[in-house]
């Protein structure tokens, strides 16, 4: 694995948080291509991949979290739809920091 990559459990958050402020001060939009990460700088672009189905999406870090171990990322509801894990709620995902 590349030094800018990680693998771990990702989850999603969505409609219940719509309109609330994210950690960087934006209003959360469940359809936006955004994610929460505990340490990466805001506005970092991350390719999140679901190895189970081969889907991937580029997301922008705009929030902090997840706060549940051992999860490594929370993605927006829209991103989870595109990655194909809304029903499961969790996925073992691959994260690759871009740029």
Write out the residue ranges for each language-model feature:
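Secreted/periplasmic proteins
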Residues: 1-99
